[in-house]
Amino acid sequence: ENGIAAFTGDGTNPTVMEMATKAIGAAGGCGVPTIKPWNIDTIREKMAQAKASGCFAVAMDVDAAGLPFLKNMTPPAGSKSVEELAEIVKLAERPFIVKGVMTVKGALKAREAGAAAIVVSNHGGRVLDQCPATAEVLPEIAAALKGTGVKILVDGGIRTGVDVFKALALGADGVLICRPFVTAVYGGGEEGVKCYIVKLAGELAD
């Protein structure tokens, strides 16, 4: 109703993707399933689930390869080369979003692989301790991708309409917000989410 799409997650438990894609399907495809950087066979399986949901785009949080809890896990996860990413982009058969970009070099690699968009994100600081804030690296990444057609999204502590304004001013095309929406859902259900959206819109308009 408000033009906001959900980014859903993935995990070592297969039910995470199953429930996420089920929810996206129930919402008429208004969601972006995010796949971890597993091995290619697992990615194919997850991608099939994602596409079956009718989603309008698919994402991969490539930085998740560095998450401590994924080490020595099954299925295995790991970093992806430009060539591997390009293969995954083709599998998606719809706009593909590379999440977890924190450098100009990474942004240009995503573009080379055929990504339609990137998410400037440090995974909440859980991949690399004491890494830069997304606001610190966003301007140079935005400058590097200017005129390429690649959309730039950003996350990282965005809570208010003023935060959204700052992100847009620094070069983002859009933002990702997580925790406040979770709080709104647990505190007030659907009505809580509506109230938070109204609050965001009002702050941004002001």
Outline where the language-model segments fall.
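Alpha/beta catalytic cores of nucleotide-metabolism and tRNA/nucleoside-modifying enzymes
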Residues: 136-206
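Small-residue (primarily alanine) positions within well-ordered alpha-helices
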Residues: 107-110, 115, 167, 172
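Terminal peptide-recognition signature
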Residues: 60, 118, 167
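Active-site entrance/lid segments in N-terminal catalytic domains of soluble metabolic enzymes
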Residues: 1-113, 124-127
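Short, basic, helix/turn surface patches
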Residues: 28-46, 128-132, 145-155, 201-206
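Short beta-strand and adjacent tight-turn residues that come in two discontinuous sequence segments
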Residues: 9, 120, 177
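Charged helix-capping and loop-helix junction motifs
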Residues: 75-78, 132-138
